[in-house]
């Protein structure tokens, strides 16, 4: 019997080996208990404020919108300790793991931001840390790999399958199946088996709560739309959660179109996938005609995931949120524009959301609109990737 609803409409659930059911039940009970405990909430909020640096700023982009009637704000999760929104919910889950008496943390990572956040939380709270990472991602995210190792984490490259996030998730689950007595699986996104999608949303929802307060203070009204990139979907659900009941606020999630939807080289299961069971949940995913998981692709490692969190699937199915996509080239152009015009280097993941915002702005420059983009992370980790692309194009030496 679940303490919390395991489904979002028809999506979600808990499709895992029987051996993991007790661990998931224990996690759900511990979360409900901690959620209702003022002492836990005080500890969590103290870490968010004094260690992670919350609240993060809401920054008006005057240069990007010059010559238009749009006011565009960025929610600056890139300023958070660790460099991305990942730190929020990792601190929450790590505190929860310690409360449950766990001594080890298992995690997966794509871009490395979740791995870095997990490593810093484990160092802070005295927990042993091992992080699974696709071998391709280890190669393209070497700065984050070194950061994790500097903070004492064991980084384990995964060579199976596509050697990306999907495969790292599979290996992390195998490890947890063998070690759940002493280890907590610190899942990095709002996906997977119940209760993870709910836990991650609740530990990320301060993004939207702060944005709501800040935009009302700055503009005296709610935004017309909030935008966020969507891989598994944690930064987006953190931004959306406090606006879901506001019918006047459009929720826009931006999936990676990769090399173009028509090429098949993308990571857009909400727009172009089919519903199935994967990673312990029922949700849309990229599948072959035979029902096998199809390899996803994105220039941004953190969006290179073949499925999506179940609450996003539900919001999409009921028409409450709109899910669009941006290509590698569009994200790269937005990355360069923000860097050169506002002096802010975004993560390539976040640049997907910005790319769609810029499209909306320039399609109707005369339209008076108030937009907020969740700048989910900073782009330090991506500078070598971008350098190599610009060099290959002959745009830099």
From Swiss-Prot:
PANTHER family per the UniProt record, alphabetical: TRYPTOPHAN SYNTHASE (PTHR48077:SF3), TRYPTOPHAN SYNTHASE-RELATED (PTHR48077)
Organism: Edwardsiella ictaluri (strain 93-146)
HAMAP family reported for this sequence: Trp_synth_beta
Keyword vocabulary terms for this entry: Amino-acid biosynthesis, Aromatic amino acid biosynthesis, Lyase, Pyridoxal phosphate, Tryptophan biosynthesis
Known EC number: 4.2.1.20
Intrachain disulfide bonds: none
Record protein name field: Tryptophan synthase beta chain
Pfam families from the UniProt entry: PALP
């Amino acid at each position: 019997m679940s303490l919390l609803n395991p489904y979002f409409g028809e999506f979600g659930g808990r499709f895992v080996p029987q051996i993991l059911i007790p661990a998931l039940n224990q996690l759900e009970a511990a979360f409900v208990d901690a959620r209702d405990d003022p002492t836990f909430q005080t500890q969590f909020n103290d870490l968010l404020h004094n260690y992670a640096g919350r609240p993060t700023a809401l920054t008006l982009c005057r240069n990007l919108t010059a010559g238009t009637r749009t006011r565009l704000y960025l929610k600056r999760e890139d300023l958070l300790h660790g460099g991305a929104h990942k730190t929020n919910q990792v601190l929450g889950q790590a505190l929860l793991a310690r409360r449950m008496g766990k001594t080890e943390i298992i995690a997966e990572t794509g871009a490395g931001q979740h791995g870095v956040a997990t490593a810093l939380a484990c160092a802070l709270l005295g927990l042993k840390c091992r992080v699974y990472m696709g071998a391709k991602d280890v190669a393209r995210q070497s700065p984050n790999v070194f950061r994790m190792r500097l903070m004492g984490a064991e980084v384990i490259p995964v060579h199976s399958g596509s050697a990306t996030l999907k495969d790292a998730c599979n290996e992390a689950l195998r490890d947890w199946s063998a070690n759940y007595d002493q280890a907590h699986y610190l899942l990095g996104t709002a996906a997977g088996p119940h209760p993870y999608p709910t836990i991650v949303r609740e530990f990320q929802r301060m993004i939207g709560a702060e944005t709501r307060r800040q935009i009302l203070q700055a503009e005296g009204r709610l935004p017309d739309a909030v935008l966020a990139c969507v891989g598994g979907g944690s930064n987006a659900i953190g931004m959306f959660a406090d606006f879901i009941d506001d019918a006047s606020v459009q929720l826009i999630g931006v999936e990676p179109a990769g090399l173009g939807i028509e090429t098949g080289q993308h990571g857009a299961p909400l727009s172009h996938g089919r519903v199935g069971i994967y990673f312990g949940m029922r949700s849309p995913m990229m599948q072959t005609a035979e029902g096998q998981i199809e390899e996803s692709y994105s220039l941004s490692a953190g969006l290179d995931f073949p499925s999506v969190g179940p609450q996003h699937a539900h919001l999409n199915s009921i028409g409450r949120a709109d899910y669009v996509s941006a290509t590698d080239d569009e994200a790269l152009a937005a990355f360069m524009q923000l860097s050169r015009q506002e002096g802010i280097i975004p993560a390539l993941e976040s640049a997907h959301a910005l790319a769609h915002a810029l499209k909306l702005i320039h399609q109707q420059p005369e339209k008076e609109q108030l937009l907020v983009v969740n700048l989910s992370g900073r782009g330090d980790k991506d500078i070598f990737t971008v350098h190599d692309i610009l060099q290959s194009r002959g745009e830099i030496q």
